Swiss-Prot record:
Bilayer topology annotation: Multi-pass membrane protein
Motif TonB C-terminal box mapped to chain: 792-809
Induction notes from the record: By iron limitation in addition to the presence of one of the two cognate pseudobactins BN7 or BN8.
Protein species of origin: Pseudomonas putida
Annotated TBDR beta-barrel domain residues: 278-809
Protein name: Ferric-pyoverdine BN7/BN8 receptor
Highest taxon of source: Bacteria
TBDR plug domain mapped to chain residues: 166-273
Similarity field: Belongs to the TonB-dependent receptor family.
UniProt GO MF annotations: siderophore uptake transmembrane transporter activity; signaling receptor activity
Swiss-Prot/TrEMBL keywords: Cell outer membrane, Ion transport, Iron, Iron transport, Membrane, Receptor, Signal, TonB box, Transmembrane, Transmembrane beta strand, Transport
PROSITE patterns listed in its UniProt record: TONB_DEPENDENT_REC_2, TONB_DEPENDENT_REC_3
Cellular component GO terms, alphabetical: cell outer membrane
Signal peptide positions (record): 1-45
Length: 809
């Protein structure tokens, strides 16, 4: 019985055993399960649905009156309480508690809920509970959650410095892929989301073979976070399902202040969905060409009458083929989270996620772009060099728990523990050789990988305001402890003997059906990676004047990595690397020109150890990458925060950039420089009109001022917009966008790909207040292009359509 048949027969058993087991154990430990979300607490909890608000900045009293009328609540307070106080306004879709928190931010007042939809206002003994600038817990700060706002931007983010800042206050380039944007474009995984993100280049070295890489400002992205907690690249973040996340925050430039080491490219922060105070649920379904089908549900709300326990459960299932022959994928997500209000000041959160993906015949490293005679191949996009016995199976599991405490006087603290593991088993096949015009010349080169890397993190910090020289400032300090362990079997490496055998030959690629003898792999040894990182950081935002702010921070890191390779019957090879007392400074400054525009500048150090596999001719690890990063820019906030704009210029200087030479050998490039410009606009242009547009120019050069990394575009432009029609057509939303990039190529003189643009469209119809139907048409003009180009290339996704529905209740 082949691997495919075993997987199909075992799928149901796996779901009933492993997935159900994870759900039962995970939710049991939380004291909740999906059915509990249907408890009568929904009916008994005093709840108000979310509403749209558009309250301008100004005096507080009329703003509160406007809010009370829009939210249909009774808000009582002494008149003297609001005298002389003002608000920054409120724009977007929020529930009552969220709206009041944002409206009252910085006023020193707080609202408390009474009976029969009544609220009272009083002076806050601990203003930090409501002040936007003083809260930075779990992405829960008022204005940070994007679900339900309908916007293509957010009101606040803490991904850059962990201080809760508005996009305008953040002294680095920031893009937030909001829940509305993810839904409108049907961006279902991280690769989809980043392909739509300005300033990010996605290089696909295959399809379904864990070979996607993400690049920003000329360098590969290596910093990933989930809810602000760093996670290893070996946990295959690229395959994360967007169904469990509220948004994706991308900070371009080095963020070593809070995220691992100081990688110069970008940091990707995935923010999980949280339980909602009000009951809500939705069911989705989708169908598209290439036999792509999916369904999911998302249920959230209070689990008790008082609402002091809240839960959320998300499930998503997809089965899909693709435009290449024999490819087939099944994936399943289960995510649960519960919040417990242990007191008015203490919040306990526990949760889990489980993602399984089984892929048949994944394409690895693409197909030749030139024949042996030198002409371009122009192969059919449906060709696949993967045999029917190849596969790529993953099971990703994560458990997390945290406790958050309001400490008084605007201070709060958080401790979070996470455990994540990624069980994988991969049997890939590479097409090797020179392709002849008659389809002959290629051989198969199979390889197998398997293992279960694990990572444990402890993250703790405290944040709050302090007074100095008569002004109030903000501070955050914390520690991160990370332990990564990977012990994997060795399967004998690349099967060159198989490539040279009759069973390994591909007689004619043009009509090959993927049939060949499956190679036998015998475990031949063990390898391991043990990596520990301990870091402490301190950051403060000083309010120098009403218009001038200064952010100063530093991070102190101890890092150690031990790797070993133990072949059975051979000599063990060990490589040990350690860095202690690494100091990473950070500085940022912002100056408000007026109520709309701000100038900013930032500086940070770059320090990043090389990957465990990056060694020189002597099998010695390369020295860590080191350098500095500079960024200058101007940012604007428009329409009461519904629209954000930015212009940035940057320069990165780096030594010891790893350049591949041959096999597993790298050299260290010195004096590399990356510089460029980024422009971006995100948010609401007018009522019902959302837009995102971004242009990026980036070029990386060596010590001789020669361009390197030419497989990355020098120029790129990405845009997407959606518009809800008015009048009798107000149930219809239409949208579309274009992704364009300039010429690229591994060698621009012998092989290159010219500039190209991919156009995408969408439409949604609200059948009634509960049910909506959508259609997405991608690559409308069926543009043929390589998503990775060189001697081997991988075609980008051809024209495709996806229809979907969503029922909310």
């Amino acid at each position: 019985m082949n691997h495919t048949a075993r997987k199909r027969q075992g799928w149901q058993r796996s779901v009933s055993q492993k997935l159900a087991g994870a759900v039962v154990q995970g939710i049991a430990c939380m004291g909740a399960s999906a059915p509990l979300l249907l408890m009568p607490a929904w009916a008994t909890a005093a709840a108000q649905a979310q509403a749209d608000f558009d309250i301008p900045a100004g005096p507080l009293a009329p703003a509160l009156a406007h809010f009370g009328q829009s939210a249909h609540i009774l808000l009582s307070y002494p008149t003297a309480l609001t005298e002389g106080r003002s608000t920054s306004g409120l724009a977007g879709r929020f529930d009552i508690d969220q709206g009041l928190a944002i409206l009252l931010a910085g006023t020193g007042l707080e609202a408390s809920r009474g009976a029969n939809a009544s609220y009272s206002l009083q002076a806050s003994a601990s203003t930090g509970a409501l002040e936007l600038s003083a809260v930075s817990i779990s992405g829960k700060a008022p204005g940070s959650t994007t679900e339900g706002t309908g916007l293509y931007t957010t009101y606040s983010s803490s991904s850059s410095t962990r201080l809760n800042l508005t996009p305008r206050e953040t002294p680095q380039s920031l893009t937030v892929m909001t829940r509305q944007r993810l839904d409108d474009q049907r961006l279902t995984n991280l690769t989809d989301a980043l392909e739509a993100t300005p300033g990010i280049t996605v290089v696909r070295d295959g399809l379904g073979s864990e070979s996607d890489s993400y690049w920003s400002r000329g360098f590969a992205i290596q910093n990933y976070e989930v809810d602000g907690v760093p996670t290893s690249t070996r946990l295959d973040n690229y395959s994360q399902s967007m169904a469990m996340f509220d948004r994706v925050e991308i900070v371009r430039g080095a963020t070593g202040l809070i995220s691992g080491m100081g990688n110069p490219s970008a940091t990707i922060n995935l923010i999980r969905k949280r339980p909602t105070a009000e009951a809500q649920a939705s069911i989705t379904g989708e169908a598209g060409n290439w036999d792509r089908y999916g369904t999911g549900f998302d249920v959230s709300g209070p689990l008790t009458e008082t609402g002091n326990i809240r839960g959320r459960f998300v499930a998503d299932y997809k089965t899909e083929k693709a435009w290449i022959d024999r490819y087939n994928q099944q994936s399943q997500l289960m995510y649960g989270i519960t919040e417990f209000d242990l007191s008015e000041d203490t919040l306990l959160t526990v949760g889990f996620s489980y993602l399984r993906s089984d892929i048949d015949s994944p394409l690895r490293s693409g197909l030749p772009t030139r024949f042996s005679t030198g002409e371009r191949t122009n192969l059919k996009r449906s060709l696949n060099a993967a045999p029917d016995w190849s596969y790529n199976d993953h099971e990703q599991t994560s458990f997390f728990t945290s406790i958050e405490q309001q400490l008084g006087n605007g201070w709060s603290g958080k401790i979070e523990l996470t455990h994540a593991e990624n069980k994988f088993d991969e049997l890939f096949n590479f097409a090797m050789g020179e392709l002849n015009p008659d389809g002959s010349g290629l051989s198969q080169l199979p390889v197998r990988f398997s293992g279960t890397p694990r990572q444990d993190n402890l993250d703790l910090y405290a944040t709050g305001p302090f007074s100095l020289f008569g002004r109030e400032h903000e501070l955050i300090t914390g520690m991160t402890l990370s332990q990564y362990r990977e012990n994997t079997p060795s399967w004998g490496g690349w099967r060159y003997d198989y490539a040279g055998s009759p069973a390994g030959a591909i007689d004619n690629l043009f009509n090959w059906d993927g049939k060949s003898a499956k190679p036998a792999f015998v475990e031949s040894g063990k390898s391991s990676i043990d990596e520990d990182q301990y870091a402490a950081y301190l950051t403060s935002r000083f309010s120098v004047t009403d218009d001038l702010s200064l952010i100063l921070g530093s991070r102190l890191i101890n890092w150690k990595r031990d790797t070993s390779d133990r072949p059975y019957g051979g000599e063990e090879t060990e490589v040990n690397r350690e860095e202690n007392g690494v100091f990473i400074p950070y500085a940022g400054v912002g100056y408000d020109l007026d109520d709309t525009w701000s100038l900013y500048a930032s500086y940070t150090k770059i320090f990043n150890p090389q990957g465990a596999w990056v060694t020189d001719e002597s099998n010695k690890p390369l020295d860590p990458m080191e350098g500095v990063g500079y960024e200058l820019g101007i940012k604007g906030t428009h329409l009461n925060g519904k629209l954000n704009s930015s212009l940035a210029v940057f320069k990165l200087e780096q030594d010891n950039l790893a350049i591949w030479q041959h096999d597993n050998v790298y050299s260290a490039e010195q004096d590399t420089t990356s510089k460029g410009i980024e422009l971006e606009l995100n948010g609401e242009l007018a009522e019902g009109w959302q837009a995102s547009a971004g242009y990026s120019y980036s070029v990386t050069t060596d010590a001789d001022d020669q361009r390197i990394n030419t497989n990355l575009p020098r120029n790129s432009f990405k845009t997407f917009t959606s518009y809800r029609l008015h009048g009798p057509l107000d149930k219809i939303t239409i949208g579309g966008g274009v992704n364009w990039q300039s010429k690229v190529g591994a060698d621009l003189h012998t092989f290159s790909q010219g500039s190209y643009a991919v156009t995408n469209l969408m439409a949604r119809y609200d059948i009634n207040q509960h049910l909506s139907a959508s259609v997405n048409l991608n690559n409308v003009f069926d543009r043929e292009y390589y998503s990775q180009s060189g001697l081997y290339g991988v075609y980008g996704t051809p024209r495709n359509v996806m229809t979907s529905f969503k029922y909310s209740f």
